[in-house]
From Swiss-Prot:
GO terms for biological process: DNA modification; mismatch repair. GO terms for cellular component: cytoplasm. It is found in: Cytoplasm. This is DNA mismatch repair protein MutH. Disulfide bonds: none annotated. Belongs to the MutH family. The lineage of its organism: Bacteria, Pseudomonadati, Pseudomonadota, Gammaproteobacteria, Enterobacterales. Keywords: Cytoplasm, DNA damage, DNA repair, Endonuclease, Hydrolase, Nuclease. Pfam families: MutH. Sequence-specific endonuclease that cleaves unmethylated GATC sequences. It is involved in DNA mismatch repair. GO terms for molecular function: DNA binding; endonuclease activity. The keyword Chloroplast does not apply. It comes from Escherichia coli O157:H7. CDD domains: MutH-like. HAMAP family: MutH (MF_00759).
Amino acid sequence: MSQPRPLLSPPETEEQLLAQAQQLSGYTLGELAALAGLVTPENLKRDKGWIGVLLEIWLGASAGSKPEQDFAALGVELKTIPVDSLGRPLETTFVCVAPLTGNSGVTWETSHVRHKLKRVLWIPVEGERSIPLAQRRVGSPLLWSPNEEEDRQLREDWEELMDMIVLGQVERITARHGEYLQIRPKAANAKALTEAIGARGERILTLPRGFYLKKNFTSALLARHFLIQ
C-alpha cells in the first residue's frame, strides 16, 4: 500500500476530506510527522496544539487560528479528541472564545459556538500519557453535525451561560454550569485580562473565557457512532 501524502491545498469536497482523514487512521503521530518532514516533540507541555497542527497539515486545513472553520470552503471544523484505550474522551473539547461584551441581539442561530459546531470532523487520537507521543495512533474519523436533540441541548446550555454573561454574572460561572457546554477561563497566565460586564452593569477586567464541550457530550457522540459499549 502506498504511503499517504499531506494535502497541499484545501480539500474541495467533504468526500475528499474524509477520504484523506481515513487514510491517516492507524498511523502513529511519529510516522505522520516524519512523512510530513516534522519533528515530534517529546511531550505536549510546550506544544499543546501540536497534534492539531500536524493533522491540519495532512488535511490541507486553511483557517489557522482565524475565527472561520478550519475548512472554510466546506464549512467544516476539525477537532482532534484524545481518547483512552476504550475510546472514551480524556478531556473537554475547546470550541471557541466566549464573548464577554457586545452581546446584545446575539442568538443561538447566529452564535460563534453554533457556527463552529455546525459540521465537525472528529479525529480520535490515543491520549493516554503512558503512551509516548510519537507512538500514539490516530483513530477513525467521524464527520458529524448535531442532530435535533444535540442542537437543543447545546442551545439550552449556551442560552443559560450567555444570560449569566449579559447579566454581569461572569465571575459566578463555574465549570458545573451547563449540562454539555461549559465556560472556563482560557488564558496562559493570570495577567491576560479582558473586559466584561460586572454585576451593576459596570466594566470589569476578568480572565478570558472559552466555551468547551463536556466529556459526557463527546463520549456519547463517539459511543453512538463507533458503537463503543
